[in-house]
From Swiss-Prot:
Entries under Pfam families matching the protein: Toxin_cobra-type (PF21947)
Presence of keyword Aminoacyl-tRNA synthetase: no
Protein name: Cobrotoxin-b
GO cellular component: extracellular region
Native organism taxonomy: Eukaryota, Metazoa, Chordata, Craniata, Vertebrata
InterPro entries linked: Snake_3FTx (IPR003571), Snake_toxin-like_sf (IPR045860), Snake_toxin_con_site (IPR018354), Toxin_cobra-type (IPR054131)
Amino acid sequence: MKTLLLTLLVVTIVCLDLGYTLECHNQQSSQTPTTKTCSGETNCYKKWWSDHRGTIIERGCGCPKVKPGVNLNCCTTDRCNN
């Protein structure tokens, strides 16, 4: 019985990947590329829009709501928002 419980515990830990944290790019379009560890988040985002300065790109953790005219791409793997 103890062996069965231990086996189930190991399988659960391996399958759930406990402690995993997502890593996302988090720079603005004009900044040097950087990444951030996103505790508690399951998404990275990249949003972009155009104005008098040209195309503006913003990256970060989460998946925010955006205003009309702002493009948004949300994704779920490490550094997927490049």
